[in-house]
From Swiss-Prot:
Lineage: Eukaryota, Metazoa, Ecdysozoa, Arthropoda, Hexapoda
GO cellular component entries: cytoplasm; nucleus; transcription factor AP-1 complex
Regions of compositional bias (Polar residues) in chain numbering: 283-300, 506-516
Summary of the function given for this chain in its UniProt record: Developmentally regulated transcription factor AP-1 binds and recognizes the enhancer DNA sequence: 5'-TGA[CG]TCA-3'. May play a role in the function or determination of a particular subset of cells in the developing embryo. It is able to carry out its function either independently of or in conjunction with Jra.
Region (Leucine-zipper): 413-420
InterPro entries noted in UniProt: AP-1, bZIP, bZIP_sf
Stretches assigned to the bZIP domain: 385-448
GO molecular function: DNA binding; DNA-binding transcription activator activity, RNA polymerase II-specific; DNA-binding transcription factor activity, RNA polymerase II-specific; DNA-binding transcription factor binding; protein heterodimerization activity; RNA polymerase II cis-regulatory region sequence-specific DNA binding
Protein name in UniProt: Transcription factor kayak, isoforms D/sro
Family note: Belongs to the bZIP family. Fos subfamily.
Keyword field: Activator, DNA-binding, Nucleus, Phosphoprotein, Transcription, Transcription regulation
Location in or out of the cell: Nucleus
Subunit structure: Homodimer. Heterodimer with Jra. The kay-Jra heterodimer binds more stably to the AP-1 site than either of the two proteins alone.
Organism: Drosophila melanogaster
Length: 722
């Protein structure tokens, strides 16, 4: 109340200042009029009135200064009267304030009229008094003096008029500054009045944001800040998401029409300030049942907030209307008469939750948060107190259960997180171990691949001859020879299928390894071969088989007729060695069974060589040696080629040393195994055979053991293409 009175007194002082400003404005208008008149008189050709007008202007300025001094002396007396008036009328403060607001314009008008009337009378009198000497001075007796005075006034007139203009301009600037200050003061007064009115309206409304003390005599910075915070929270609609979804409570929208409620206009002639706005604080599904956590109402505000329940302590489930607070109804007297206003608001509230049997309709004022709430309210029945105690105990238990449940859930989640972290760490370690093992295995595989390739190449070097395992040294010896020995690759003509088969003498030309097998032949191989039983040749055994199936298939082999069908071909003529000069046939052909090692044995004479070849060929087909042949077949290296029998003529030369051997008139000058290579026949290919010097047998090469024959690398050889 003291704050209200202080603001009203300030308002009265401001009104007095406004009156003074109006008086200053009137004086300014009069001064401007006089200045205009002076300028007109100075510009006129008649100079007789110069002295009178300047004198009148000076008199008018003096009168204005006197009036201002009188007003300044009168202002303190008016303020003292107003203070005494407000002190004597504390109970009817609002009425007097409103009456004074209505009476102030009337008083101002009366004062301004009175002052203006007096001022006009005074100025008229002064003008009359000063114009008389100006008129009487115009006589013939004082003509010379008048002329002198007129001349002096003419010289002094510009100076006096310029000084008057400068003074008037300075006075106008001072007046504009005063007007600007007065406008700022009026704005501050409006703001103070608006804040005061909002404080009246919000003094009975609970928002839980600030606390208005009951003993504050004036508007302190703390209270103004609290009012601003309250307005900010009321105008912002961000409270709906604050505790949404907590224990079934929903925060209501507080003051949706707060802008309409807070009327910012200053009432001018109103004797009462009715507040008839409706504040809806109803919850969405609020009820007053005893079995619901949403049974908080305004009576719960009077208890101490000693629980940490999820519900908001300053919200309730009641919907009420703010009562009509009449400004003249506060008649209790005294300074801190604030309980009457609260009682008026609480008495006009609506019933909480219509249709509920357990609704609390207490008229206790709800505090706005902060501080310790009273233990009991004034209008509380014993039943309501008991219900409140039961509800309070139940809320405490529910809050404790909620806290315990929240702690348990947090602990469970923490343990689960720790377990997952441990599991992830173990999985990372396992991944590292597996990665290391994978790298080691890859390294071992990379280092072992070269060894595997070498072993495979060594295994592929194993060859067979007529189904028998033959050493690589014998094959290499059979495909090449030195200059002092002749090597006859013994081929067989299979009469059952009509194909020429024999040992592969070109295996060494394919880039394979030439490391021989660890085969240790018997010491007396001649006596061992003599005991081998002769058996017929099995047509199913293919002498061209190998491990990797090299060469063309059997269907591409050259087919030659058997020697028995050829006319006039004698065995002795075929096996007769020829000289090197005639380019003789180096491949003997026989009609007997194929022999594996026939080409590896020395040739002493024609007859002995034939017997040796026949005996060896017959002995090589024994089942004793065939039983050791358990390896896969070798790739065929012969070409199955059908030729007409009529065109096949072997033209052999005489049994001379230099007679050439011809097939259909073409002399054969290169040694071969009796097998025509497919590539060499088609494209010329790579059918390269090592050729030595003159193939003339001597005694040094014929007496050697079969396994002691020279290898292809024994002597340098020549490569001749077909």
């Amino acid at each position: 109340m003291i704050a209200l009175k202080a603001t009203e007194m300030q308002h009265n002082n401001n009104a007095l200042q406004q009156q003074q400003q109006l008086q200053h404005q009137l004086l300014q208008q009069h001064q401007q009029q006089h200045q205009q008149q002076l300028q007109q008189q100075l510009n006129s050709p008649d100079n007789n009135y110069i002295w009178a007008t300047t004198h009148n202007a000076n008199i008018s300025r003096n009168n204005a200064m006197l009036q201002l001094q009188q007003q300044q002396l009168r202002a303190p007396w008016i303020t003292d009267c107003n203070k005494q008036h407000h002190i004597n009328n504390n109970n009817s403060m609002n009425v007097n304030y409103n009456q004074q607001l209505t009476q102030q314009p009337q008083q101002q008008q009366q004062q301004t009229q009175y002052m203006q009337h007096n001022y006009n009378n005074y100025t008229q009198q002064q003008q009359q008094q000063h114009l008389v000497p100006a008129t009487t001075s115009q006589s013939n007796s004082h003509f010379y003096q008048c002329n002198q005075q007129q001349q002096q006034q003419q010289f002094l007139a510009p100076t006096t008029t310029t000084a008057a203009v400068v003074v008037a301009a300075a006075h106008q600037q001072h007046q504009t500054q005063q007007q600007h200050q007065s406008q700022q003061q009026q704005q501050h007064q409006r703001q103070d009045y608006a804040s005061l009115q909002m404080g009246r309206q919000l003094g009975n409304f609970e928002t839980g944001q600030s606390v208005l003390t009951l003993t504050t005599p004036t508007l302190t910075p703390t209270t103004t800040r609290n009012i601003e915070d309250t307005l900010g929270h009321l105008l912002s609609d961000t409270q709906t998401d604050r505790v949404a979804g907590c224990a079934g409570f929903a925060v209501p929208k507080v003051l949706p029409n707060a802008i309409d409620v807070l009327g910012m206009g200053i009432p001018t002639g109103v004797s009462s300030l009715p507040l008839q706005q409706t504040f809806d604080l109803s919850l969405g599904q609020g009820s007053e049942s005893e079995d619901s956590n949403a049974s908080y109402n305004d009576t719960q505000m009077n208890e101490e907030q000693d629980t940490t329940d999820t519900s908001s302590a300053h919200t309730d489930s009641t919907s009420y209307q703010a009562g009509h607070i009449m400004a003249g109804s506060v008649n209790g007297g005294g300074v801190n008469n604030f309980s009457n206003v609260l009682a008026a608001v609480s008495s006009s509230r609506g019933s909480a939750s219509v249709g509920s049997s357990n609704a609390n309709t207490s008229n206790t004022p709800a505090r706005r948060g902060g501080g310790r709430r009273p233990n009991r309210s004034t209008n509380m029945t014993p039943e309501e107190e008991q219900k409140r105690a039961v509800r309070r105990e139940r809320n405490k238990q529910a809050a404790a259960r909620c806290r315990k449940r929240r702690v348990d859930q947090t602990n469970e989640l923490t343990e689960e997180v720790e377990q997952l972290e441990k599991r992830g760490e173990s999985m990372r370690k396992e991944i590292e171990v597996l990665t290391n093992s994978k790298n080691q295995l890859e390294y071992l595989l990379a280092t072992h691949r070269a060894t595997c390739q070498k072993i495979r190449s060594d295994m592929l070097s194993v060859v067979t001859c007529n189904g028998l395992i033959a050493p690589a040294g014998l094959l290499s010896a059979g495909s090449s020879g030195s200059g002092a020995s002749s090597h006859h690759n013994h081929n067989s003509n299979d009469s059952s299928n009509g194909t020429i088969t024999g040992m592969d003498a070109t295996l060494n030309s394919t880039g394979r390894s030439n490391s021989p097998l660890d085969l240790k032949p018997a010491a007396n191989i001649d006596s061992l071969l003599m005991h081998i039983k002769d058996e017929p040749l099995d047509g199913a055994i293919d002498s061209g088989s190998s491990l990797d199936q090299d060469g063309p298939p059997p269907s591409k082999r050259i087919t030659l007729p058997p020697m028995s069908t050829m006319p006039h071909v004698h065995l002795s003529t075929i096996l007769t060695p020829t000289g090197a000069s005639s380019g003789s046939l180096q491949t003997p052909i026989t009609s007997t069974a194929p022999g594996g090692f026939g080409s590896a044995f020395p040739v002493t004479s024609n007859g002995s060589s034939i017997n040796n070849i026949n005996s060896i060929g017959n002995n090589m087909n024994s089942p004793t040696l065939n039983a050791h042949n358990k390896v896969p077949k070798e790739r065929p290296n012969t070409l199955a080629f059908q030729r007409p029998l009529g065109q096949m003529h072997l033209t052999m030369a005489n049994n001379k040393a230099g007679g050439p051997t011809q097939i259909q008139g073409v002399p054969i000058q290169t040694p071969s195994t009796g097998t025509f290579n497919f590539d060499s026949l088609m494209d010329g290919g790579t059918g390269l055979t090592p050729v030595s010097g003159p193939l003339v047998p001597n005694s040094s090469s014929t007496n050697k053991h079969p396994l002691e024959l020279p290898t292809p690398t024994a002597e340098p050889s020549k490569l001749v293409s077909l």
